[in-house]
Amino acid sequence: AHGKPYLPGHPQICFNISHSGEYAACAFASIPIGMDLQQHRRAAWERMAERYFSAEDQKRLAAAENAETLFFRIWTEEESYGKWRGTGLSGSLGTEKKEGFCTHFSPEKGYEGAVWAAEPVKICMKRIEP
């Protein structure tokens, strides 16, 4: 999808949302942000890397000690960048020069997340039980 979520009547509040596995995440800031969260899913990541990742990122994966973790780290970087820009994912990932800053997070083992913004952001995680 293209575009960014917004709160009508409150343009000063920027936010982005994501969900995967047992987690839903929402990031708030005073500047535009993009955020993605992914649960590691063993079955699909290798095929997705072959299809979507640049040749350079595929080489990094082939040489990585923990390729699965690196895959989800790269994927969340790309997804959060596209969400920050409001363009979503498109074309071969990792082929364009990126502006801004990416901050990684992981709510628990088996999950990778990233927040992208024009300047470094501080991440504060809060678990809310149903």
Regions found by a protein language model. Name each.
Residues A1-P130:
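Core catalytic alpha/beta fold that binds nucleotide/phospho-ligands
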